[in-house]
């Protein structure tokens, strides 16, 4: 059985910087784990449930938003065609030509832009860049930044325009 994250967010707690920081740190960890799991899926082709189970056994999830990890991992897989269709016009390469880790980061970020409207687009971009700095090639973060900067206005037009005012 998959354990559920017991650190549920309460909107009344949003005023507390410690709680907000704790939630964002757990989400960052979830994004890192999901990126690694998506990379593993791409490279090894194992089943999602098998990869998820392995990650939960092999890693300490005490500082990870486990629910968000699962949502990202399965959400990217379920919506991969829609994600790749959204990504393609913003790329100078084909999906197949992309570095596998940068592809995992871009798919994860695109999923958040498409399906997690509650996460501000600037947060999605910044998190994608940070993931690329940790896991990507030397200039991978610049590539990820460029793609997400093109993608965000296409997927979050109203939000991006409102921010630029």
UniProtKB/Swiss-Prot annotation:
Name by which UniProt lists this protein: Transcription antitermination protein NusB
Write out the entry's keywords from A to Z. RNA-binding, Transcription, Transcription antitermination, Transcription regulation
> Which Gene Ontology terms describe the biological processes this protein takes part in?
DNA-templated transcription termination; transcription antitermination
**What family does the Swiss-Prot or TrEMBL record give for this protein?**
Belongs to the NusB family.
Stretches for region Disordered = 1-27
Presence of the UniProt keyword Transcription in the record: yes
A single Pfam family, by name? NusB
In which domain of life is the source organism classified?
Bacteria
Q: What does this protein do?
A: Involved in transcription antitermination. Required for transcription of ribosomal RNA (rRNA) genes. Binds specifically to the boxA antiterminator sequence of the ribosomal RNA (rrn) operons.
Which organism is the protein's source?
Answer: Pseudomonas syringae pv. tomato (strain ATCC BAA-871 / DC3000)
Compositional bias (Basic and acidic residues):
10-21
Under the cellular component aspect of Gene Ontology, which terms does the record hold?
A: cytosol
> Entry's PANTHER family?
ANTITERMINATION NUSB DOMAIN-CONTAINING PROTEIN, N UTILIZATION SUBSTANCE PROTEIN B-RELATED
Instruction: Return the Gene3D superfamilies for the record.
Output: NusB-like
Molecular-function GO term, any one: RNA binding
């Amino acid at each position: 059985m998959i354990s559920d994250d017991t650190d549920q967010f309460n909107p009344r707690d949003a005023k507390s910087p410690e709680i907000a920081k704790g939630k964002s740190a757990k989400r960052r960890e979830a994004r890192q784990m999901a990126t690694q799991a998506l990379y593993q899926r791409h490279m090894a082709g194992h089943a999602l449930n098998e990869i998820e189970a392995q990650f939960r056994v092999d890693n300490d999830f005490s500082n990870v938003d486990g629910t968000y990890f699962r949502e990202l991992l399965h959400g990217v897989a379920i919506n991969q065609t829609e994600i790749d269709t959204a990504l393609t016009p913003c790329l100078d390469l084909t999906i197949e030509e992309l570095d596998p880790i940068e592809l995992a980061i871009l798919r994860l970020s695109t999923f958040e832009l498409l399906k997690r409207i509650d996460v501000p687009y600037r947060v999605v971009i910044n998190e994608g860049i940070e993931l690329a700095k940790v896991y990507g090639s030397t200039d991978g973060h610049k590539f990820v930044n460029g793609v997400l900067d093109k993608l965000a206005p296409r997927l979050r037009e109203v939000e991006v325009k409102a921010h630029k005012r």
